[in-house]
Amino acid sequence: MFRTLTPAKFGPNDADNVANLSALADKMVADFDGPKDGPDAEESGIPALYTYFGQFIDHDITFDPVSSLTKQQDPDGLVDFRTPSLDLDNLYGRGPNDQPYMYDGIKFRLGEKLTGAGVPDASDLPRFKGRALIGDPRNDENSIVSQFQALMLRFHNRMVDDNDSLSFEEVQQRVRFHYQYVALNDFLPRIVHASVLDELRTAGQYDRSKLAHYHWKTYPFMPVEFSVAAYRLGHSMIRPGYRLNDADNMLLQIFPDPHNPDKNALTGFRAMGPGRAMDWGRFIDLDTRPYGVEDDDTNPDNKKRLQFAYRIDASLVDPLRKLPPEVASNPSSLALRNLERGWRLGLPSGQAVAKAMNLAPLTDDQIIIGKAVDEPGAGDPQTGIATIANGVFAGNCPLWAYILAEARQFQTAVTIPATGAPATGINTPQLGPVGGRIVAEVFLGMMFGDNSSVLSLDPQWTPVTGSSFALKDLVAYALGQGDPLH
């Protein structure tokens, strides 16, 4: 998108670049704070499932098995091994004719029944020797995205049942339309500030002519500014852990405790254990639940509440400081991996991208590394970007960190669907005019450039249940609730 800009440098040689980026990465990771029930000052007003819906979308549109963290890379030489379109190839794979082991006729095969949440027909993914038989193996990398993949299998299967005269391809198109509709009309407005999205519309409709920075010749491509920086916003939304259901042992860390590796965690690439079915109302607002009481382990409402994503900010939770060896290594810090990848791929600084967009860049004083909580405490350090690594980042912030820090400046008070919640809403940082514009233009461009997408075939289309159809309705439909979809 901005390939004519000069790559950002953070030192005179490779060793200094890595050392300085490592210093920044250390400041971007919060102190240890284990998973807990109850409200949390780091929560946004975005239900937790949107973090993993974003991951599901990422697996639909991107796959890069070849770029390196040990040498400089030419971004033009990278290949996206996924189609850069929201076409659900991570769900459908190559279809029932080419991958019949995933299908039973034109419906998906489902896995073993799951227990623990009282959810009818909850099931694991179909597996062979523990490995999931699905369109993209990455959608089994943690328990949440794995169960969402299984839910999407059920969404397709119910669509088949409700439309028994349709062919596989016709059902597939309807599933894609609903998924794309949610991505455009629910997911994007959750993570991108309304002022950014408004600039991409004409008379309330997204307008291809408003795409100012994302242009393709024949087919849409995957810009590194999106895949390596802007769309890595989800890493800051991850909580230290999540409660799957009521059971005492189902408040789980995202990774195993290195001091107690046998303890349950949300690690994937294995069959679901007993009692691990997700109560979806803890992840998306299927119903109205109590908000809970902060720092009160005795309050029974805290175990049943809807969990919310952490705020989009320049801070990651402590478990992401050192990823398990089976996930990543050298480096094991997720923040450093992101920063190094952006540098080795030659990304410009956030300030340079802002100027190229004809925007006034954030000042160094506005680029705060740390949690965007309302009232920072002793455990919430707020570090100005210019004070890190002897000022090497002054006026020269890595694009990923810049985009996360920018969100702090674009907060919206979100009213959340919970009894007892703050009447004024929850302050929720959203992607601003640099990060949000990159994400929104790539989403829209991928759809405008795909001749089979909802924006290309029928931009006025809405689900039969109404224009308010959202992720919660997609989940409810997959669970067998609500009216049929056609």
What are these regions (language model features)?
Residues M1-R138, N142-S143, D161-H486:
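Terminal regions of secretory-pathway proteins
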Residues L153-D162:
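Active-site nucleophile-adjacent alpha helix/oxyanion-hole segment immediately C-terminal to the catalytic cysteine
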